[in-house]
C-alpha cells in the first residue's frame, strides 16, 4: 500500500500536495479496494503530509470605486451551475516575486470549477481583468443570454470598459457586496488552493515575475484543470468532469 501511495504522490510535481482524502480517491479510481482510514494510517506512519493552509493567511481586500455601484448580485451565494458556461466567477490576487508584485486574475466556471481564463500583470488594472476575460471568451463557446459573470465590486470589475465588454458578449454582470468574501466564495476558494499547493509549498520561491508566470502555467493548465481531482466532482478533475458531461446522452 505504501508503494501505491508514493506513486500517486509522484505522478506530477504538484501531486505531493495530496493529503489522505485525495490519495484515497485516486487509489479508488485506480481500482484499489482500500479504506480511507487505512490510507490515513499509512500516510501518518510514514509522515506523508498533504498541503495545508498556513496560519494567519488572509485574502486581500477589495477597493470599490466610490462612484460605481456595480451590477446587482444575481447569484446570492448560489454558485451551482447545471452546465458549463452558465456561471463564471472572477477575482484577482497577488504573488510576491524577487522583482516585486505580480497580480493574477482568473475566471472560473462554476460547473466544474475549471479555470477558463487567467492573466498576469505587475499592476491590478482593468486591462488585467479584461485580459483574463478575453482568454476565457477565446477558449469557450458562450451563447448570448445564458451566462452570468460574477465578481466583487472592485474598481477593475465595475469599470465601464469591463462592463461593456460583458454586455457586448451577451453576458450578464453580477457583483457581490463589498467586504463580504462569502459573496464571491467560489472565486476566492481558488486562491487558497493555489497558494496552499503552489505559492506556500515548502521551497517555493519566484526570483522573477516570468518564473512565477511559468509556475502558474504548469499549475493551472498542467495540473489543476486536467489532473487535480476534487471530491465535489465525484473524484474527477475539472476537465474530466466536463468531458463526462459532454458524453452524457442527456446533454447532447
Regions found by a protein language model. Name each.
Residues 1-252:
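Charged DNA-binding/catalytic regions of mobile-element recombinases
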Amino acid at each position: 500500500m505504501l508503494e501505491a501511495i508514493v506513486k500517486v504522490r509522484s505522478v506530477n510535481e504538484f501531486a505531493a500536495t495530496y493529503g489522505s482524502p485525495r490519495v484515497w480517491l485516486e487509489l479508488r479510481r485506480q481500482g484499489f479496494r482500500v479504506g480511507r482510514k487505512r490510507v490515513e494510517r499509512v500516510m501518518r506512519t510514514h509522515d506523508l503530509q498533504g498541503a495545508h493552509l498556513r496560519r494567519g493567511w488572509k485574502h486581500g481586500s477589495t477597493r470599490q470605486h466610490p462612484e460605481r455601484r456595480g451590477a446587482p448580485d444575481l447569484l446570492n451565494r448560489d454558485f451551482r451551475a447545471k452546465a458549463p458556461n452558465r456561471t463564471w466567477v472572477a477575482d484577482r490576487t497577488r504573488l510576491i516575486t524577487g522583482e516585486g508584485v505580480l497580480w493574477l486574475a482568473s475566471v472560473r466556471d462554476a460547473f466544474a470549477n475549471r479555470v477558463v481564463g487567467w492573466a498576469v500583470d505587475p499592476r491590478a488594472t482593468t486591462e488585467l481583468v479584461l485580459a483574463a476575460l478575453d482568454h476565457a471568451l477565446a477558449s469557450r463557446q458562450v451563447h448570448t443570454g445564458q451566462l452570468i459573470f460574477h465578481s466583487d465590486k472592485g474598481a477593475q470589475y465595475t469599470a465601464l470598459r469591463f462592463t461593456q465588454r460583458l454586455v457586448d458578449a451577451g453576458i450578464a454582470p453580477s457583483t457581490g457586496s463589498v467586504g463580504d468574501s462569502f459573496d464571491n466564495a467560489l472565486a476566492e476558494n481558488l486562491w487558497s488552493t493555489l497558494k496552499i499547493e503552489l505559492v506556500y509549498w515548502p521551497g517555493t520561491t519566484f526570483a522573477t515575475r516570468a518564473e512565477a508566470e511559468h509556475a502558474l502555467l504548469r499549475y493551472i493548465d498542467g495540473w489543476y484543470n486536467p489532473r487535480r481531482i476534487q471530491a465535489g466532482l465525484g473524484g474527477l478533475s475539472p476537465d474530466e468532469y466536463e468531458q463526462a458531461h459532454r458524453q452524457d446522452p442527456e446533454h447532447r
